[in-house]
Structure formats: structure tokens, C-alpha cells
Amino acid sequence: MANDENTDGVNKSEKMEKMCEFIRPMVQNNPDGWGPCELPDQFKDIPYQPFSKSDRLGKISDWTGTAYQDKKFQNKYNSQFGGSGMKAYAYEHDEDETTFHLVDTTRVQKPPYQRGRFGQRNQRMRGRGGQRGGMSQMQALGKLKIHERDRRGQNKRWTRRNQAPIKMRDASVTVRPDWVTIEEMDFPRLSKLTLPGVKEGEDVLCCGAVEYYDKSYDRVNVKNEKPLQRIDRIFHTVTTTDDPVIRKLSKTEGNVYATDAILATIMCCTRSNYSWDIVIEKIGNKLFFDKRDNTEFDLLTVNETSVEPPQDDGNSLNSPRNLALEATFINHNFSQQVLKSNEPRYKFDEPNPFISEEEEGEVASVAYRYRKWDLNNGITLIARCEHDAVMQGPNNETQFLTIKALNEWDSKLANGVEWRRKLDTQRGAVLANELRNNACKLAKWTVQALLAGSDQLKFGYVSRASVRDSSKHVILETQQYKPNEFATQINLNMDNAWGILRCIIDICMNQKDGKYLIMKDPNKPMIRLYDIPDNTFESEGEEEDSDEEEQVKDAFQR
């Protein structure tokens, strides 16, 4: 038994020795670095990405990463162990989204007074730079250039962003295919023309009767306003060729014929923005400047030269056409209300040539003065001019007046000043604003007063009683100027005005006999001269909308 136990113990020890036998592993010596010299077969052709366990992985994989990274930030988030291979998987710290709040992204329009704030900042930078060394001055100068460049760019963007959308205006008359363009005259060239030395016009014939001006209206002010009344009188707007006096004078006097309104439109054309047209007939060596009947030529524009002229639709209360009808209605009623209607009129030698026996109603107070001007080189101009009233001067002399009315429709929409707040204290600011918004209309009124030889040009300030009602108005104040002084104040150069007229006359005189048309381009600063067929506009009355004609007629007969 003892032998058997010894034998079993030997066998167990042998088994234990076999189980605990140490097998020496294959050790590869890599003198050039760490790791095996050869890759096992199972690990061949597997892409290897070096990494470090301490690196913070931002993504599992990036299929949209760029092939080339920005060298400026190559060591910002990459591990020193991983090298450039971790660039695609580099962890980047994002802002904590728990502090995220929705904010109002609406752009706030900067007021105009903030435009110069960059200039003030530049001045402070310039002051600091002057106290430092040369390098600081160079840095400040560079910053000044950057701020100046940014300021210009921001001003340009501000201007484009805040400009009103440009609305294409319609032409006063449709250009037909059979019209031939003879000349295009742009405003910059016309502004350089001059005809100095034109003397005061000579009276050829005076006719009509006018009433005396009521000086009590000079005391009207904002606190003592007067309502504008409706005066039912007849106004005649006769064109040149329909004037019996001009027809008679054309046989013996002059070779160019027109009315003061037509001449003022041509002479002040460089200030106009809206489209207008004038018909010219050349018969032999004579020119007749005409307007088309029952058109908007005689309507007064409103805010034509404003930065943002009225652009409402045709049915709107403040559309350009409705505002023009309102302004014409105001002018006619104001020019008759401020007169002494109960006193005898001042009469010229000849009666009003346009009164017919068929007309019913009272004719408006108006006197016509037919005058003659010598424009040199054989050009003699005959024009019909108008006076609205007379009054006694300081020395009891008779002074002739041209009476016009400026109207306020909506100061907020017109980018203007509120008359009821400014007229009594800052009348000059109100007039300056009107000169900006209605430069063409005021210039034409001044030219008409100068052509007629009026002694005074009287303005009335008429405003709506309610902003939303264009039928009721009140007179807030009156003001008068001498035409020559007012022309200087509004920078009206009569030598240039005569030069423009003479240029157009010379071009037309060189054409063959026929009918021509001058039209202001509705969207460009230029006028064009067309050669049109002789029968043009003869059947126009049947083609045009009768409703529009009735509106224009009603504006002159109310």
C-alpha cells in the first residue's frame, strides 16, 4: 500500500511539472523603435489611426472634414501623441446651450444723427495716438483707415436699405411708332446754357379786369386761421393757337408765340421730375407753342421734387393725380377769396377776350398782358401773361399781384414740418422745406410773375382741416415777395432760363414746316423733341377717357 501511494505521488508530481512548464516566447528586437518588427497576418491591411487615451474624442467619424486644416490652429486641440491624424476628430469646446435664449433679430433703423459717430470715435483715437510712440501712432492710423472704410460701407448700405422703392412713372403722352426723334437734350447740358441781356418785355396789349387785394388776410395766422371758401367762378385756360388776340398779333408782331405757363414749363424744365409735353407748330418762319386740351398740363404738382414723392395708387386720397387736383382747386379758390369782391374792379382798356355770351356765371378776377421780347437774331417772342389782383402801394401807386397757394396735405407722409407748429415761429423753415419739395412749381410761379411784370408775388399757406379730408381747408398765413428777390433766393437764373428757351427755338426753326412735340422723359433728366404727323391729337378727345377730362374741367370751373 505504501508503494502504491509513492507511485501515485510521483505521477502527480510529473503531471504538475508538465502543466507548469514555462515556454519561452518569441521576443523580437526592434532597435529602431517600439512595437513588433513585422505585423501578424491577421492585422495586415488594416488602417491604423494613432491615438492617445487621454485625447477627448468629439465624434466617431467625420465624413465631411476638409483635407487641409488651418495651420494657425493646428496645435490647439490636437494631442501631441496623436499628431496631425487627430485633426479630423479633435474635440472643440462649444458654448453651453443651457444659456441659449431667443432674441429679437429685427433690424433697428439707425437715425440720421448717428451717422457721424464713427468720425467722433476716430477723433478720440487720433488723440490717444498722438500721446504715444511711433509704433502706436502707426497702429492708430491703420485703425483709422479701417474705421473710415467701414463707415463708408455702412453709410452706403444704410442709404440703399432706407431708400424708397423706385417707381417708374408714366409718360404724359404715349410715344407712337411713327414719331421721329429729332433731338435729346439732357439737363446737365441745358443747365449750362445762357442768354444774357434779355430786356424787360414790352406791353403790346392789356385786357381784362382784376379785383383789389384784401389786406386783412395779411393778419391771418395759425391762431387766427380762416376757412377756405368755395368760389364759383370761371377760369379760362386757353392755349396759344385758340387765343384770338395772339392770332391777330401773329399777322403783325413777332414770330414765336406762347403763354406764360408754357414758357415757364420750358424755362424751368431742368427742375422737373414729372413728365409733361408741349406741341409746337411751325408755319413758315413762325413757331406756335401749344398745350393739348383737357390734359394735366395745367394741374399743379405736389411734392414733385421731394426725396420721396407721393406714390400712392390712383384711387388713394394722396395719389399724385388727386393731390394735383386738390392743389389746383386750392389755388383757384384762394386767389379769389383774398380779394375785395364787393368793390369795383381795376379794368384795362380792352375787355376779357375769352368771355362769350353763352357762358353763365362770374368770370374769375384775371387780367391778361400780352408782351413782346427781343431774343436777338431775328427772334421776337409774343406771350400772354396774367395778373391775379392789384393793390395800392405805399405811395398809392397801383401794384399788380401774382397770387399762389402752397398747400399742406400730410406733413408726416410728406417728410415735412408741421405748419401749425412752425409757421408762427419758424416761417423760414417751412418755406425752405417747400423749396425742397416743390422746387419746380415755385420756380415756374416766379418765372410767370417775372414775365408778367408783377410787382409782388403773394403766397398763401393752406392746410387741410383734417388730414383725411381733402375737401375742407383752412388758410394759416400769407407771405409776399418781390419776384426778383425771390428768384435770387431760390437760385433761379433767368439768363439760363432764356438760354434754354432760345436753344429749343433755334432747333425748331431749323426744321421743316410741320408739327413737333417736346416731352420730358418720365424717368430720366432729359427732354426729347419729336417730329409728329400733322393730324396727331386731332381726334384725341374721342380716344381719351371722358371721366378724366371731366375731372380736369371741374378743377378749373369750381
From Swiss-Prot:
Keywords: Cytoplasm, Initiation factor, Protein biosynthesis, RNA-binding. The keyword Protein biosynthesis applies. It is found in: Cytoplasm. It comes from the Eukaryota. GO terms for biological process: cap-dependent translational initiation; formation of cytoplasmic translation initiation complex. Pfam families: eIF-3_zeta. InterPro entries: eIF3d (IPR007783). The keyword Protein biosynthesis applies. Residues 537-551 have a biased composition (Acidic residues). GO terms for molecular function: mRNA cap binding; translation initiation factor activity. Residues 296-310 are annotated as: RNA gate. Its main location: cytoplasm. Disulfide bonds: none annotated. GO terms for cellular component: eukaryotic 43S preinitiation complex; eukaryotic 48S preinitiation complex; eukaryotic translation initiation factor 3 complex. Residues 534-558 are annotated as: Disordered. PANTHER family: EUKARYOTIC TRANSLATION INITIATION FACTOR 3 SUBUNIT 7 (PTHR12399), EUKARYOTIC TRANSLATION INITIATION FACTOR 3 SUBUNIT D (PTHR12399:SF0). The RNA gate region regulates mRNA cap recognition to prevent promiscuous mRNA-binding before assembly of eif3d into the full eukaryotic translation initiation factor 3 (eIF-3) complex. Component of the eukaryotic translation initiation factor 3 (eIF-3) complex. mRNA cap-binding component of the eukaryotic translation initiation factor 3 (eIF-3) complex, which is involved in protein synthesis of a specialized repertoire of mRNAs and, together with other initiation factors, stimulates binding of mRNA and methionyl-tRNAi to the 40S ribosome. The eIF-3 complex specifically targets and initiates translation of a subset of mRNAs involved in cell proliferation. In the eIF-3 complex, eif3d specifically recognizes and binds the 7-methylguanosine cap of a subset of mRNAs. Belongs to the eIF-3 subunit D family. This is Eukaryotic translation initiation factor 3 subunit D. It comes from Nasonia vitripennis (Parasitic wasp).
